[in-house]
């Protein structure tokens, strides 16, 4: 509950909403090798990590629908393809729905309420912009709340079409691409994320869609514990073997690493560095470990993995070495349980968050016998700020509440 209230408080702090992103100034990278900004300990020791456990929320979480067991054919995901948000075009399944099919469709009141927040807020902003009046924080907050709740609405593909939500001039693209209103950067990011989800006909509101949930050990009935796993039948699975942002948005959030793998943000269910030999690293995750990373937001000092061969680094470490030579940026995800030196203002409240692209500016070998490398990562300019505070904070209060409900339901799985 404390984390949900804290996130809600952070999301409502700003009464003055900036209409364009505060882009961090370019950081001059350093040549190899590079040293950390503080003395390193002779032996690695885990840093003290703030507790990530949360009590059962008191606030109502009834808005989070139950996990879908089956989907009707008309609401099945078409494929894992995703749109070009710079030139959005409604998907075929959306365009193929005829008006006559929508006439008798009844949209549930709870769904209508939150979708109307998005559209009413957009209409108010557009009316003001046409009168050369700058929309205020309350106008944007209405849209913000509507979008955040929309991720968890139990709706259908027909409802998305009936409400014109993928239309370029009336739907979500009007926020991130086409409209006369200069919306805040974080609204554009979240509208684009929701658009990508719905464009693929992914209407499942569950955080754990496409995941087979493991079950706790129950000695009374003789059942061993099982772990979560990817559902091989899930059509929306994306893969993370690419450089750059791809379909991912700044601040996109997942409750677990497996969910990030499902959506193609990362490629390994356990490892922190993902890549390909001879090509480089695609993504790296700041999580727990024996070596405390150093996190300054725009700059990170990130440890590679220990090698059993004193003459050669691990494959994961070698991937990042290759990035330092090719200058291919790496996707960086931060986990709530990451191990860092000192206090960390960039840690998500729960789960893991995508924080954009970083260049591997340099590295040095900290332990030759174990081939432990320390990499200097520098966040690329012209990206939105890291979403750790303010109205743009991720995870959102809705995401935290949905995660709490999922944990409660999982605890009582038969």
Please tell me what each predicted stretch does.
Residues 66-353:
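Acidic, glycine-rich low-complexity segments with interspersed aromatic residues
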Residues 343-413:
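Compact mixed alphabeta submodule
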Residues 1-99, 399-414:
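Ser/Thr-rich, low-complexity intrinsically disordered regulatory regions
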